[in-house]
């Protein structure tokens, strides 16, 4: 089990980091090719990307958990129906997003806080991302299913190749073809299509557990997928809401340049969070498998190992970011704006304290989801993503940018305390 655990988490971390580089690559190339206004537009549009990404995770993690549990009892017909219902739900949601993007992108951009200076770039990013929603949803969903179907290597390969192609296409479209913001977002949208083409190879594998079959619609299957996957979607949605809230507060304090600085800090934060998502998602198939077979010993071992690794990774990442904050900021500050430079460095040093607790919270949330305790998982996500961060950021914003940066670590610390209490209660019940 330990060897499988190491294999799964290593591959999953690589894959999740690759996905996080979608936006990081955009951030870097937009900073170099378009400038501060482009960074601001990108950060204003990120909440929508989080929402779309979250829906894909909900479908993938929800159906993946069901797949892992159903495999224990060799219920292949039910597994195929879970897959078919996942495709149906993804298609319906994807089409709705496409229509919304085509018709309402300008209104949505205004709602997200875009002013006249950045409106056109924000609309371009939003409209293009939303038109390609089905690709993002199916890529995330199929990736999680393939990983749960004992093929983590293919899932990771798809993510890494797609991410590398995104970087290459970003460079080509922005610097060689001079396509501006559209070039950046178009490169990002082509990446999941590349990922899907690689993931489709799983259907040629003899040991593949799920296949497309004739759909026998059952609302209960959709309900179960959503219930199990909802905590994963909630993580992404809450992340997007935090970005939206911070953007709104920062615009009032320091204007567009403050949002650009937050965009730099936020995108590096998201890459680091992707490491913990990878750690947790690597644990998930094995935890669900142990839960399905009532193997309490393995459940405890997996939880302890994952939490220990989370704390070790947090220490390494924080030390690296703290000592290299100046260099990291310079990579995204082509115009050498002193305000952006100062704000971003301050943000790195304060906000990243929360990384120690964020890692623990992500692991605990995924653990509870894996053992079908979705209510506890959702409670933790709502605490760190809405209930605590919203009042904390609004109140602490009275102290300027230092207050904004401090609100996130505070929320993560309190959530960790609540998560530990839930864990002890769960152990006492069992």
Go through each PLM region and give its residues.
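N-terminal transmembrane alpha-helices
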Residues: 1-34, 47-62, 66, 91-98, ...
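Small-residue-rich hydrophobic transmembrane alpha-helices
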Residues: 39-99, 136-155, 261-319, 325, ...
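Helix-terminus/linker motif at the lipid-water interface of multi-pass membrane proteins
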Residues: 21-40, 109-116, 172-179, 240-267, ...
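Transmembrane helical elements of multi-pass membrane transporters/channels
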Residues: 7-26, 128, 139, 162, ...
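Short alpha-helical transmembrane segments in multi-pass integral membrane proteins
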Residues: 1-13, 67-132, 176-230, 287-353, ...
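Small-residue hotspots at the loop-to-helix junctions and early N-terminal turns
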Residues: 36-47, 122, 126, 185, ...
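Structural signal for membrane-spanning alpha-helices in multi-pass inner-membrane proteins
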Residues: 27, 101, 144, 170, ...
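Short runs within selected transmembrane alpha-helices of multi-pass transporters and secretion channels
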Residues: 60, 128-147, 155-166, 184-199, ...
